[in-house]
UniProtKB/Swiss-Prot annotation:
Protein name: Mediator of RNA polymerase II transcription subunit 27
Localization: Nucleus
Annotated organism of origin: Xenopus tropicalis (Western clawed frog)
Family under the similarity heading: Belongs to the Mediator complex subunit 27 family.
Keyword Transcription regulation among UniProt keywords: yes
Length: 311
């Protein structure tokens, strides 16, 4: 029966074609490895380029040779005879194999996604309930008398407590200077000077950080009337990048029940930029990439990465 099914097929050529396919894949892999590694260390630029071109040409010749050999063997394999149909066994390929159907993995992924969605929805609901605002004065009606009184939240903290928290954080980091002001009432604004590297304007609402603007050490952070400029961006792209990362850090450090811990964690993360222009990237080992230093700091380890290397 096996001999009858093999009529018209050159099994030896078929076996050689399989080995040739493996050799072709290896040759193509060597081509991409050559492109990935680039020019190797040589005495001169010309020698590096000459060695790279020579190696690349050799790898392309190997690919061309294996491809020609595969085309030659494909003509020798032949076609199976059609005089021996597979009958009902030919329908086996139409039925899905239950062991290879990714139904369980897809259901498990959907279940995890549903649980995560429910968890984050609960967190968002709790945060929105804590920071709820009165949208209209018409709420002071008959129904308002039946509503229970709103419990005080962490948004209503005394200014003395906020000053004490900021003062303790200022003493924690000698290379960081924090100036606190309240130009618009009870809301605090911080001017954080990190060594001679950068300055950060932090807009706060009680102990919650609403906005951060990072500028260079020599840039002007005040408006014409002497107030902190909370709207103008930095003139330098590197500090614009750090501003974007600081905004991401505000979304990462979220603990409404302990806002002082959030502020301290954010200041600890911000302090890691003291070596903004001195620390190399932990992945590529370079100081500059596209003309910029490593502007990203890991939230857990505080290690420096380029924006493209952290992914």
């Amino acid at each position: 029966m096996a001999d009858a099914l093999n009529v018209g097929v050159n099994l030896e050529a078929f076996s050689q074609a399989i080995h040739c396919i493996q050799a072709l894949r290896s040759s193509v892999t060597r081509v991409f490895d050559c492109l990935k590694d680039g020019m190797k260390n040589k005495e001169s630029q010309e020698a590096r380029e000459r060695a790279f071109v020579s190696e690349f040409q050799d790898n392309l010749h190997c690919v061309n040779r294996d491809l020609n050999e595969l085309e030659r063997l494909s003509n020798l394999v032949g076609k199976p005879s059609e005089n021996h149909p597979l009958h009902n066994s030919g329908l086996l390929s139409l039925d899905p194999v239950h062991d290879k159907t990714p139904l369980y993995s897809q259901l498990l992924q959907a279940y995890k996604w549903s649980n995560k969605l429910q968890f984050h929805a609960g967190l968002a609901s709790g945060l929105l309930n804590q920071q709820s605002l009165k949208r209209s004065a018409n709420q002071m009606g008959v129904s308002a008398k039946r509503r229970p009184k709103v419990q005080p939240t962490t948004l209503a903290l005394p200014p003395q407590y906020i000053d004490d928290v900021i003062s303790r954080i200022d003493r924690m980091f000698p290379e960081m200077t924090i100036q606190l002001s309240r130009p618009n009432g009870s809301s605090a604004m911080l001017l954080v000077t990190l060594g001679k590297v950068l300055k950060v304007i932090v807009v706060m609402r009680s102990l919650f950080i609403d906005r951060t603007i990072v500028k260079g050490y020599n840039e002007n952070v005040y408006t014409e009337d002497g107030k902190l400029d909370i709207w103008s961006k930095s003139n330098y792209q590197v500090f614009q990048k750090v501003t974007d990362h600081a905004t991401t850090a505000l979304l990462h450090y979220q603990l409404p029940q302990m806002p002082d811990v959030v502020v301290r964690s954010f200041m600890t993360w911000l302090r890691s930029y003291i070596k903004l222009f001195q620390a190399p990237c932990q992945r590529c080992g370079k100081f500059l990439q596209d003309g910029l230093p490593p502007t990203w700091r890991d939230f857990r380890t505080l290690e420096a990465f380029h924006d493209s290397c952290r992914q």
